[in-house]
């Protein structure tokens, strides 16, 4: 399951993300953050951290540097 999710993120980063350009308000990008958190912490905690990060992605959040902790 984890490998499948990482594969889908890789497909998104390789083929879809370049089409929309650099629009992420965070560094690293949300897809990179998801890949790092899933690789570092596994499926459950990685998905939890990714969900929290995506919930922060809205016009009222300033964004900025938000590394995987």
Swiss-Prot record:
Family of the protein in this entry: Belongs to the UPF0161 family.
Keyword Cell inner membrane tagged: yes
HAMAP family per the UniProt record, alphabetical: UPF0161_YidD
Locations listed in the record: Cell inner membrane
Keywords for this protein: Cell inner membrane, Cell membrane, Membrane
Membrane topology, from the record: Peripheral membrane protein
Pfam families associated with the record: YidD
Primary site of residence: membrane
Any coiled-coil regions, as ranges: none
PANTHER family given in the database record: MEMBRANE PROTEIN INSERTION EFFICIENCY FACTOR-RELATED
GO cellular component entries: plasma membrane
Protein name, as recorded: Putative membrane protein insertion efficiency factor
Main function: Could be involved in insertion of integral membrane proteins into the membrane.
Cytoplasm recorded as keyword: no
SMART domains, alphabetized: Haemolytic
């Amino acid at each position: 399951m984890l490998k499948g999710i990482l594969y889908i993120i890789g497909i998104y980063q390789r083929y879809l993300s370049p089409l929309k350009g650099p629009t992420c308000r965070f560094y690293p990008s949300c897809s990179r953050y998801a890949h790092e958190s899933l690789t570092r912490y596994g499926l459950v905690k990685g998905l939890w951290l990714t969900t929290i990060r995506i919930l922060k992605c809205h016009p009222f959040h300033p964004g900025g540097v938000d590394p995987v902790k």
